[in-house]
C-alpha cells in the first residue's frame, strides 16, 4: 500500500507508474515477485492509500486520511492478503497510528492479524538513493517471510 498516486498514476488511472513504478518493479523482481499484468497471474496486489492525487501534490489533510481509513481497512479485508507492505508515512500513520517511516521500516508489525512491514517507498528511494541499502534489507526480510508462508 502506497501513499497517494503520483502524477503519472493520476494521468493513467493506474497505481505505481513512471520512474517510481519502474523502480518498484525492479525491487519486486529482485525477490522473485512481479505485479499483475495481462494474462500473467501474480501474488502481488498494489493500491494507494488515497485513490486520488491531492491538488498541487500537497500532503493529504488529516480529515482526508481519516475519511479514507475505513475504506482502506475494508479494501484490505476484501483483498485478504497474507502479508502487507506499507510504502509511505501516510499509510503507516493511518493503519499503524505511527508516521515516522524511517523509524518504522525494517520492523514487523501486525494489522488485524496480518504481518505488516513498513518500507521506504520507491519514490523516496529515487530522491534519496543512499537509502536503497535499507530498502534491500527490507526486501530480503520480506522475501524470507514470504518463503515461510
Describe each region flagged by the PLM.
Residues 1-149:
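A polyanion-binding, active-site-adjacent surface
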Amino acid at each position: 500500500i502506497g501513499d497517494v498516486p503520483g502524477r503519472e498514476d493520476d494521468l493513467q488511472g493506474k497505481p505505481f507508474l513512471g520512474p517510481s513504478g519502474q523502480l518498484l518493479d525492479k525491487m519486486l523482481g529482485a525477490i522473485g515477485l512481479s505485479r499483475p499484468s495481462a494474462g500473467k497471474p501474480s501474488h502481488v496486489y498494489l493500491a494507494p492509500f488515497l485513490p486520488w492525487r491531492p491538488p498541487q501534490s500537497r500532503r493529504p489533510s488529516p480529515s482526508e486520511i481519516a475519511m479514507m481509513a475505513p475504506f482502506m481497512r475494508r479494501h484490505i479485508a476484501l483483498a485478504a492478503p497474507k502479508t502487507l507492505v506499507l510504502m509511505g508515512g501516510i499509510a503507516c500513520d493511518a493503519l499503524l497510528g505511527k508516521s515516522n517511516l524511517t523509524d518504522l521500516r525494517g520492523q514487523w508489525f501486525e494489522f488485524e492479524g496480518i504481518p505488516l512491514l513498513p518500507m521506504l517507498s520507491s519514490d523516496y528511494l529515487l530522491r534519496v538513493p543512499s537509502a536503497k541499502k535499507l530498502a534491500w534489507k527490507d526486501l530480503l526480510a520480506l522475501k524470507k517471510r514470504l518463503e515461510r508462508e
